[in-house]
Amino acid sequence: KNGKRILVSQVHGQTFIDLPLSNPFHSIDTQLLSIINDHEIDYSFLEVHAEVTSEKNGIAQNYDGKFTAIYGTHVHIPTSDARVLEKGTCFQTDIGMTGDYNSVIGMKKENAIKRMRTGSNSHRLEPAEGLATISGAVITTKEGDTNSIQSIQIGGVLDRNLLS
């Protein structure tokens, strides 16, 4: 809009993830920051898909001021720490999921709990079918002004629709 350039990107964390993934710091340093600078990106949004909150927070603190917003995903439960960091980057450790929160991370409770109790993956996980909550964050940017971030949960058992 109005000739502005927007970058939306994602990196994966490594802690407790048993996959051959690139180090997210290396990926940001060698790829994303170059794109932001070389292509004169006006607004940049980074999703950090990671298991642990400390890794998401470390990335956000390290790149504060380099991205418009950094937000975490993967653990399905929204954190209550949406804020603007010292150098102006909007951050929330995890924006949560869109799904039924009367569940175990969006799956039917019974089978998920059986898997936990028995340590066996033989119980098939199935999506919960209850009322969904849309979780996320609203990030507001204004050129030359302070950015803001607001956590949202709309509908379902977590409803706190502050946008209406």
Segments the model singles out, each with a brief description of its role:
Residues 1-164:
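Acidic, metal/ion-coordinating pockets
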